[in-house]
């Protein structure tokens, strides 16, 4: 994931976590939850220490009630606000919760210089402002993490620690669809393979990760229709669920308009690999080069396609966080 993409998706995730818990400001603990919700190396490292997104959310709730009890306030269960559902979060998109002074200072001083999730996690627990009473350290300690060991571990991770972004390759694996190029990318997500399989195969939730909501035309029993506006013409794409098993979900996307009517534009093949505390999602994008000009230009434009893969995986991580 590029530095800009990491920073923006992290900001979005931390705001969503604060909103989900109905908190009035984004605090450092929401920044940690954001890293878990974002997926990637930091989430995988934390999962190896037993800290999943679900466990960290529960720990924030436990610590909040413990702090209230410490000053003599005890809320009955009936008065405790329920977390906001995924549907509510989607409906309320656009509203922004302000950063607390502590979070704003961290972002202003360090935010844009943290180009990977591991660097962001290291900064959260290694900042000169961190003490044994800091919210992030308290949260991790509450989850049973040896924070000193975690600091040492993170210091040994290289700056460019996210999974390598591979170059495209030729393939005949998807020749039955008429596709001749493949790109792949992998990302750790703090969710179970079963949860992700249910999410990824559901046509009603394609807009959570695959199709921009404003481009959705229709939802079908086995897929959806997408409208893509171009500078000269509008194209329609038919998404179809090809494979849906516990460890693999495959979607094909066929052009259903214009002179390319009936041609498969791409296949998104998602492999779910169980990992400690979550799932490694491997996204394989098989696609075509669209004629001689496409073949000539492809060595120049394929990096933009690769960026699309990274955005898709980030969208899946976000959707899983909202769905849990």
Named regions from a protein language model:
Residues 1-190:
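Histone-fold recognition with a strong bias for associated Lys/Arg-rich disordered tails
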Residues 228-237, 241, 266-270, 275, ...:
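Long, compositionally biased intrinsically disordered regions
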Residues 190-211:
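Amphipathic alpha-helical segments
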Residues 207-208, 217-263, 323:
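Glycine-rich portal/gate segments that line the openings of hydrophobic small-molecule binding cavities
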Residues 297-324:
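A conserved amphipathic terminal alpha-helix motif
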Residues 257-307:
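Beta-strand/loop substructures that line and gate deep hydrophobic ligand-binding cavities in soluble
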Residues 181-183, 211-214:
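A short, amphipathic edge element
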Residues 196-197, 206, 224, 283, ...:
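Hydrophobic pocket/interface hotspot
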């Amino acid at each position: 994931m590029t530095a800009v993409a990491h920073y923006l998706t992290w900001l979005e995730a931390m705001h969503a976590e604060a909103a989900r818990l109905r908190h009035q400001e984004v605090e450092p603990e929401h920044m940690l939850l954001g890293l878990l919700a974002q997926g990637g190396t930091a989430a995988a490292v934390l999962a190896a220490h037993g800290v999943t997104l679900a466990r960290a959310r529960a720990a924030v709730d436990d610590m909040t009630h413990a702090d209230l009890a410490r000053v003599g306030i005890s809320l009955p269960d009936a008065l405790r606000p329920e977390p906001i559902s995924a549907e509510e979060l989607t409906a309320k998109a656009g509203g922004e919760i302000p950063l607390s002074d502590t979070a704003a200072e961290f972002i202003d001083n360090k935010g844009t210089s943290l180009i990977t999730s591991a660097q962001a996690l290291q900064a959260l627990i290694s900042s000169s402002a961190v003490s044994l009473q800091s919210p992030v350290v308290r949260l991790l300690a509450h989850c049973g993490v040896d924070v000193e060991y975690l600091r040492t571990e993170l210091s040994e991770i290289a700056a460019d620690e996210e999974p390598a972004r591979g170059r495209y390759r030729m393939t005949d694996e998807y020749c039955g669809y008429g596709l001749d190029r493949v790109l792949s990318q992998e990302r750790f997500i703090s969710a179970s393979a079963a949860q992700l399989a249910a999410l990824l195969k559901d046509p009603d939730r394609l807009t959570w990760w695959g199709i921009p909501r404003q481009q959705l035309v229709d939802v079908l029993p086995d897929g959806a229709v997408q409208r893509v506006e171009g500078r000269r013409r509008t194209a329609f794409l038919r998404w179809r669920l090809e494979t849906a098993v516990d460890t693999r979900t495959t979607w094909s996307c066929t052009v259903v308009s214009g002179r390319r009517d009936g041609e498969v534009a791409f296949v998104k093949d998602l492999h779910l690999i169980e990992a400690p505390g979550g799932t490694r999602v491997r996204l394989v994008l098989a696609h075509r080069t669209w004629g001689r000009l496409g073949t000539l230009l492809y060595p120049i434009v394929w990096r933009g396609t690769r960026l699309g893969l990274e955005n898709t995986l980030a969208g899946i991580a976000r959707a899983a966080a909202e769905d849990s």
